[in-house]
Curated annotation (Swiss-Prot):
Species of the source: Thogoto virus (isolate SiAr 126)
Cellular localisation: Virion membrane
Protease in keyword set: no
Name of this chain's protein: Envelope glycoprotein
Assigned keywords, A-Z: Glycoprotein, Membrane, Signal, Transmembrane, Transmembrane helix, Virion
GO BP: any one term: symbiont-mediated perturbation of host process
Primary location recorded for the protein, binned into one broad class: virion
Transmembrane segments: 479-502
Function: Attaches the virus to host cellular receptor and later induces fusion of virion with host membrane.
Amino acid sequence: MFLQTALLLLSLGVAEPDCNTKTATGPYILDRYKPKPVTVSKKLYSATRYTTSAQNELLTAGYRTAWVAYCYNGGLVDSNTGCNARLLHYPPSRDELLLWGSSHQCSYGDICHDCWGSDSYACLGQLDPAKHWAPRKELVRRDANWKFAYHMCNIDWRCGVTTSPVFFNLQWVKNEVKVSTLLPNGSTVEHSAGEPLFWTEKDFSYLVKDNFEIQREEVKISCFVDPDYWVGERKTKKAFCQDGTNFFEVTSHQFCHQYACYNFSKDELLEAVYKERAHEKSKDLPFGNKSWTVVTASIDDLHALSAAQAFELEGLRASFAELDSRFRQLSEILDTVISSIAKIDERLIGRLIKAPVSSRFISEDKFLLHQCVDSVANNTNCVGDSAYVDGRWTHVGDNHPCTTVVDEPIGIDIYNFSALWYPSAAEVDFRGTVQSEDGWSFVVKSKDALIQTMMYTKNGGKGTSLTDLLDYPSGWLKGQLGGLLYGNIGVYLLIAFAFVLLIRLIKSAGLC
């Protein structure tokens, strides 16, 4: 026994002839890598979801306006000469708008062009706005009077109607989910689902109808919550969630995103997010109280967003390069460990490459592989004449009996890793802006048409052409000249009297 121990110590001493065991430094321990703590967490949160079966409501928009110009031509000396011209708004009533929408036509009143004398009384009476029908009509502005010493009346109408689907949002209003109709100016109008909404604005009338109900269901919403979310130099708390193809940021336990509203159950982590975001009111938002659906991005905005994404991308590239470098270091360390252990466990390399081979090292880093018996049975330690005992394959014998495993082995997880989240592509619906919808673009174009009409006066206004001058009625020139001549005869008499008086004064003074 003593001889065996001496030989073992001698062999150990010979194995490391270049190591000085008489001097040492330390002690040391293997230090572990301490990554930056990750505060973001992913969790399923319970919520009550309110949704609708449709994504559009039906908008009917109609307008009606009358142009009334009551003029008198009494010449320059008559202070009553001039025109009283105005636009009168006659928005259709609710019943009228329903009829307009179903017939795709609008109604308007009588037209009066250059009505003079007793016919000019049409401008003084009550106008009947529903006597004629047309798919659409634009007025012509007239405010001239070519009849001296007479009144003249000009009445014309404009009207139009459209019916088209428009999108909407759902919104919490006093703990109740309402339908929020989005208007082109950025404001919203809330109403209950299934209840038509009617309102007027100057010469326009609007009717919004929907045929859906708000459905309620209990769901699980997947959210990433980060209590240490950095925005530049400012730290805040954020919660980003996904519900199917919808992605949104949650700022309160009652939250809405387009066609869905959520009432989240109480959660300590989410409550901290709500408290942090409570001070961010609508006045602090970039666009105030306006709906974000009316705001469009400029080229500069897109360039700024692209630059921010490029910066983040470069940061990711640098992080991946660092990870790749660390992985290479780990691979080198692991190769060294495997090489060292494989000199003791000759089957290690075979198990790693999934081949029935054993290794035999012939130098520090070079080895040979030997073919071995392939283990095909997984419920016994014996294969043919070989038995697996104490981590080694040996011959079956009295000292190495075969053992059969009857019970299914129980797995032991020594890592306790949680499952990774794998992102998946989702189709996001883009709605565009409110102004781009057919119904609201009709309203905008109609208002622009009225502005252009008011800039152009028939017979002598903006854009006058030879054809326009020839459109003057017969007698117009005579009326203008007559008004100029007869309406100013008093002026001419005064000038003649002053001239005669001046001559008499000169003669009496002996100057001529």
